[in-house]
């Protein structure tokens, strides 16, 4: 669990997301409150539930990115799902409990990667020994100790230096059992898991001799050895705890399941999805193949643009489960300028790095960046407002010629992206509303 203070969390988010300080503060406080809860006595800890958040703002202003970066900072299991994917129980489609099942799968994957990284050196040593056993089978009647100290060490050195990478060897590797996909109704995942385990056990522990290059064999054997070292039962128990105590669910498009006075039809199903979400957000127990998961302390961050509906159109019970409301601001020209330059991996830095691979120096001037920001803002105002995503479209169109011709240009040529260059490439399209609707 992250022990970052709210100020540290906001500063870390500032490296990737421009503006939206209110939203950053809200999620930073929510993250810190988790740490505070874990410092409380056991009996009080169970009573303190997370204060779920509702983010309100147009598309492309940073709602999803804030939640995604927060989960990375917290090193917490995180899942982003669209509320529109789900249907009311009784209708054909996914039921909302699959959110928690997917979250547990994410936690298992995350913890397995962490555990494998920790055991990497042990697994590599074991893989080296298995490959050396193939390269240097012990001689009959020879002294294995003597061999180990001389020839084996020479070969180990060659193996580590990559001198044997392209040598082909015959090695016994695990024979992966045939995958069996079983379709079952929602809620029957436990039975599916048991059946799949039964089928896979028929082919488990089998090895197969295969001819492979040393570098490929090393990679496969290392993964096999790492899998042997990971304690699966402990991993599952830790994943369940991580989900229950630190899980974050990002519910996008929540406004699309809200009632609206302007829409008619389909309201029953929409309200049904909200009612199904209620117990999940409030706290219930969900059955998964890894055990029962309590959702009482999972943090839910809901978001929506609320163009055609208002937060008050959500059913009152769900409104009550989302006590923290944060409005995100629409982006201005200055915001666009900052987005182009300030983030640690900003779009301009990405394009400069991509051009560098072709030995081209791409130079964005200050007035060029200002003009790009202006065009992105103008097109958003005149057509559909898609927020910062508009910059991707504008930059791709702007640098299309450079991207196409870069490999034909002389090495170390500098291309200056000035305001004049931007107008030359985009001016006509940006001014013509009909064209910009289709191209930008």
UniProtKB/Swiss-Prot annotation:
Keywords recorded for this protein, A-Z: ATP-binding, Chaperone, Cytoplasm, Nucleotide-binding, Stress response
Presence of keyword Nucleotide-binding: yes
Annotated compartments: Cytoplasm
Domain of life: Bacteria
GO molecular function: ATP binding; ATP hydrolysis activity; peptidase activity; proteasome-activating activity
UniProt-listed SUPFAM superfamilies: P-loop containing nucleoside triphosphate hydrolases
UniProt main location, coarse: cytoplasm
Name of the featured protein: ATP-dependent protease ATPase subunit HslU
Taxonomic source organism: Marinomonas sp. (strain MWYL1)
Gene name, Swiss-Prot/TrEMBL: hslU
């Amino acid at each position: 669990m992250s022990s970052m203070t709210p100020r540290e969390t906001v500063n870390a988010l500032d490296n990737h997301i421009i503006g939206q300080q209110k939203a950053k503060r809200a999620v930073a406080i929510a993250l810190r409150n988790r740490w505070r809860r874990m410092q409380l006595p056991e009996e009080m800890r169970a009573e303190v539930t997370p204060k779920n958040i509702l983010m309100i703002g147009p598309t492309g202003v940073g709602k999803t990115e804030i939640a995604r970066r927060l989960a990375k900072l917290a090193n917490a299991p995180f899942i982003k799902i669209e509320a529109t994917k789900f249907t009311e129980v009784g209708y054909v489609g996914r039921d909302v409990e699959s959110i928690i099942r997917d979250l547990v799968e994410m936690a298992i994957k995350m913890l397995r990667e962490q555990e494998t990284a920790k055991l990497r050196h042990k697994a590599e040593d074991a893989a080296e020994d298995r490959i050396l056993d193939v390269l240097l089978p012990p001689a009959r009647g020879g002294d294995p100790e003597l061999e180990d100290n001389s020839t084996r060490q020479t070969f180990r050195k060659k193996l580590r230096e990559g001198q044997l990478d392209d040598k082909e060897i015959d090695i016994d590797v695990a024979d992966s059992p045939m995958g069996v996909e079983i379709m079952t109704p929602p809620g029957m995942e436990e039975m599916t898991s048991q059946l799949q385990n039964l089928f896979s056990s028929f082919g488990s522990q089998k090895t197969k001799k295969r001819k492979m290059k040393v570098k490929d064999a090393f990679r496969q054997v290392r993964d096999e050895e790492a899998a042997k070292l990971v304690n699966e039962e402990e991993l599952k128990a830790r994943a369940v705890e991580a989900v229950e105590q630190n899980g974050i669910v990002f519910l996008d498009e929540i406004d699309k399941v809200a009632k609206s006075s302007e829409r008619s039809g389909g309201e029953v199903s929409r309200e049904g999805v909200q009612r199904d979400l209620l117990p999940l957000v409030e706290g219930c127990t969900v059955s998964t193949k890894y055990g029962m998961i309590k959702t009482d302390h999972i943090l839910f961050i809901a978001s929506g643009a609320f163009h055609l509906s208002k937060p008050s159109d959500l059913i009152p019970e769900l409104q009550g489960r989302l006590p923290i409301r944060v409005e995100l601001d629409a982006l201005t020209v200055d915001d666009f300028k900052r987005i182009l330059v300030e983030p640690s991996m900003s779009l301009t830095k990405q394009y400069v790095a991509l051009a560098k691979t072709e030995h081209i120096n791409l130079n964005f001037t200050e007035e060029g960046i200002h003009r790009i920001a202006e065009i992105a803002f103008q097109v958003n105002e005149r057509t559909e407002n898609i927020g910062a995503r508009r910059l991707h479209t504008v930059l791709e169109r702007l640098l299309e010629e450079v991207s196409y011709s870069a490999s034909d240009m002389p090495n170390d040529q500098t291309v200056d992206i000035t305001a004049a260059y931007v107008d030359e490439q985009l001016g006509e399209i940006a001014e013509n509303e009909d064209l910009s609707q289709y191209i930008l």
